[in-house]
Structure formats: structure tokens, C-alpha cells
Amino acid sequence: MATLQVDVVSAEEAIFAGEAKFVTLPGEAGELGILPGHTPLISRIRPGTVKIVRADGGEENIFVAGGILEVQPGMVTVLADTAIRAADLDEARAVAAREKAEEALRNAKDKADIAVVEAELAMLAAQAVAARKLRQTRNTH
């Protein structure tokens, strides 16, 4: 079966590099599914989970807080603002951080502070949802 090279990187580190059969991720206009030979594409990525079905059939799940996607017929590159391996996601910590950010939003004085906190809240909410979905998936298998 044909595969494609997938690279997921953040400013901190390379999270994944390898061959895959299939990739799904949250694109700006909705969920994207990418197979080998996909039409070239550049898109923004919304916060959510990148699911990679490796060439060996295993799966990698990576939370991204947004970023840029580049697709070429044999390659997918995800340049993430922040990327966290599913195994490292902590739903309780994300919920606690979201509560702290909500408090900061209530105390924000100017539009710039409000915009920064709102972006952080959106990312933390998506992270909590991703952690919950991944936990539920693990519990059903």
C-alpha cells in the first residue's frame, strides 16, 4: 500500500516523523482526511487532534493548538504552534488551566489582554476535549 511521509513539528521539538497510510486533522474549514497522492494544499489548522495511521497500522494521536498544514502528493507537514503527544495530555490539568484563564479574562482590562486570554481559552478547551475523547477511545478498546 502507498504511504506518505508525515512530519509534525512545533517550536519546541519534532513530535513525529515517519511513514503513514492516512492522516486526519482539524483544518480551518473542517476535518481533513489525507491519503497518499492527495492534491497539494496549504491550510491553517484549528486546535484539535492530529490522528496518524502509521504504515505498520499503529496510530499516533497528537494534540495541536493550531498551526499550518502543507500537503504534497507524498508528504504532509504540520507546523504546530504547540504540539502534545496524546499520552502526555492531562485533562484535569487542562481544565484547571482553563479555570485560571477564565479568571484572568474576568480581570482583563484592555482588548489586547482579552484577545490573548480568549485564544488561550480556546486552546485549553480544545485540549480538554481532545484528552477526553482519547481517554474514551482507550476505554472502549
Curated annotation (Swiss-Prot):
It is a peripheral membrane protein. Coiled coil: none annotated. It is found in: Cell inner membrane. InterPro entries: ATP_F1_dsu/esu_C_sf, ATP_synth_F1_dsu/esu, ATP_synth_F1_dsu/esu_N, ATPsynth_dsu/esu_N. GO terms for cellular component: plasma membrane; proton-transporting ATP synthase complex. It holds the Pfam family ATP-synt_DE_N. Belongs to the ATPase epsilon chain family. Produces ATP from ADP in the presence of a proton gradient across the membrane. This is ATP synthase epsilon chain.
